[in-house]
Amino acid sequence: MRKALVRQRTSALKMFAAPTSGWIANQNLAISAPKSLQGAEVLENFFPTATGIEIRRGSSLYATLGGGDLPVTAIFDYNNGNNKRLFASTATTIYDITVVSSPMNYRLSTGSDEIITDGGDYIGQLSTGGLEVVEGLSGGDWIVTQFATTGGVYLVAVNGQDPMQLFDGDQWFAIDDGDIYMLLYDAETAPFVENETLTGGTSGATASIVHVEDSGTTGVLYITDVVGTFQNNEIISSTSGSATADGTPQPYYVGITGVDTSSLSYVWSYKNRLFFIEKESLNSWYLPADKIGGVATPFPMGGEFSEGGKLLIGTSWSLDTSGDGGLSEQCVFITDEGQVVAYQGISPDTAATWSRVGGYK
């Protein structure tokens, strides 16, 4: 008996329009309409573009923060002309990862045995060893904004647990209700160390050292919590350091009063003014225009949100048109209940130029 020949299976080519509208889960994709969106029910490892889709690119390890045992909580940058910095944080530390010599931590070994020096030290490298710029933190969920004033361009960071952090393009400073002063010194006999108490040998004045710029026998101390009056040419000393004061302390940064900066969980700028959200509340705060310090003014918003909750984020929102017929920049507040309130104007201090323009859900 002859067997029937098995015919080769064929398949027809079917063309589908590229899902330029991306992933769509709230429409029936089986129904075609003249103006229906060109989307996909499943879109994995692809990104939609205006003309088609492109495959998701891969990734490579750039840096390992600390020992690699804590997750990365935030990545943020500073960009001011040629001064470009990249920072990353864990729950305890902020690192400057602009330049990283090795993406991973490693130790030299011979087979299963690691090489150890006579002093008991391992031979190897930490990816971000020496790149710590802020340490001893309680939280790492940083919200950051870059803010320019007539005095400089700054990175302002809050996390609702630690004092506000300020990066001035060179150094980081913790900003609380205490002012920061700059004190020059010379004739150094022993180097100063941060977080120690500075004492004036003649005046008896004291202060906390928050940052040190050491140039050998001369340098600059940045101090806060000053009690008393330091004198020029007196011996100044701490547990570790000693030198001669070259002048008297000069104001460097003004602290923020009126609110504990450790309670601020969100920051943004609007009309050349910094706004903040107080964590677990419906309270917002703002600083004077063109300032990174000073007296913070409360802007309570409990009466604006009928469903209560807490403020989650705030932002500056620009519209194409306004009541004046031109571009409109609005200050927007959003709660965890999904309510949105928008304001327009110069400052909440001035009722004549500050008004509520909408509430949304």
Label each region the model flagged:
Residues 102-106, 126-132, 171-174, 243-245, ...:
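Beta-strand initiation motifs
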Residues 127-160, 220, 253-257:
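Aromatic/His-enriched, Gly/Pro-containing loop or helix-boundary segments
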Residues 137-141, 179-180, 260-262, 360-361:
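Short coil/turn segments at the loop-to-beta-strand junctions that recur within blades
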